[in-house]
Amino acid sequence: MPSQSPYHALSRYFSFPNRDHQAWWTGKGPLLGNMLADAGYPEQQQYQYLTLFNLHLIPALGPSESHGAGIDGAEWKSLLSGSGKLEFSMTYRKSAVSLRIAFEPTSLLAGTKKDVFNKRRTQQLLGDLERLDIDIDTVLYHPLFDTLVVSDEEEAALQNAGTVIPDSSRTQQLLALNLIEGNVRADLYVYPYVKALATGTASSTLLWAAVKKIDRYNRFRDALSILKGYFETYPSSTTNPMFLSSDLAAPRNAFCRLFFSETNFSWERVQHLWTLGGTLSDKPTLKGLELAKILWDILGISTAPASPDSFPLLFTFELRPEQPYLRQKLGIPVSGLTESAIANACVAFFERLGWDDHAASYRTNLSAY
């Protein structure tokens, strides 16, 4: 008898409490199983992570994409990169590939009068995950929630004022679970847009305050001073503070990242923002900029300004307790490119880096999804 994949083996013994649960499992489980196998996870870990997905994550995904609306016909639209409420992605390093599950915890109540801005489900899920044998510490969750998520009173004030908030801007919290060597590292993403509307406080002010709130040991003081100083010195109408992320770890070990969108697609602007106007000139910064330029050229990025309905560039600044105090990343939108063009660009980039194994397997793996 031919051996079954972990997904098919588990499917024989899982029961489903409702049709949404079954739809999520049959719709997304095979993809997760294939990606785990292609990334080289040992079979035992494939069973582990598929079980985690079925038993603990699917109940926090809310109505399935095929069934749509929740209670009272409410249909929650997540902010998650235009891909719906759930996203699987791979992180490539020279000698390894790891998987990431990003999603907005959601319930049937999301978008109804009982949970207008889908605030409740994330905290409930984190409580469930804390009871598992994985490395999650939620001590930083509460100060981030209090600083960046609307309170019940602020929520009521927005409703009473008749404030119109687009569906795509209602998301306030996302989770990403990084699947690493049989363990899970959880990252929390918090968006202050709704809080800024409710309080009349600029998103940047809320984000700076949130960093200070979770920085109990002044680990990010120097990094924050450099970053804040740049944006005060070089204000730009094309750059906007977007959100903050922190891993859910002990405060002495947790990282903090700040994200900024950029609608100016000129390479000169990328250089200026990446180096913070020349303030950052250390070797890791310049090497990262060099690699970003290689990918930029391979993709053939247009220098035209982003249109209102297109995705901007996304800059990430990770705050660090030692030099170099900031570590940058650049997210380049690929909307408008075909999957074939994107795959060819990734393969070409891997080849430039000398990552021959990744270059050889990337197209084949992608075509299977």
From Swiss-Prot:
**Entry EC no(s):** 2.5.1.-
Q: Please state what class of enzyme this protein is.
A: transferase
**One biological process term in Gene Ontology:** alkaloid metabolic process
Q: Where does substrate bind?
A: 87, 191
Q: Give one GO term, molecular function aspect.
A: prenyltransferase activity
Q: Which UniProt keywords apply?
A: Prenyltransferase, Transferase
Asked if the keyword Transmembrane helix belongs to this entry, the reply reads no
Binding, dimethylallyl diphosphate? 100, 189
* Applied use: Malbrancheamides have the ability to inhibit calmodulin, calmodulin-dependent phosphodiesterase (PDE1), and induce both endothelium-independent and endothelium-dependent relaxant effects, suggesting their potential as vasorelaxant agents.
Described function: Prenyltransferase; part of the gene cluster that mediates the biosynthesis of malbrancheamide, a dichlorinated fungal indole alkaloid that belongs to a family of natural products containing a characteristic bicyclo[2.2.2]diazaoctane core. The first step of malbrancheamide biosynthesis involves coupling of L-proline and L-tryptophan by malG, a bimodular NRPS, to produce L-Pro-L-Trp aldehyde through reductive offloading.
- Family membership: Belongs to the tryptophan dimethylallyltransferase family.
What NCBIfam families does the record point to?
A: arom_pren_DMATS
Name-wise, this protein is Prenyltransferase malB
What is the species listed in this Swiss-Prot or TrEMBL entry? Answer: Malbranchea aurantiaca
Name of the gene: malB
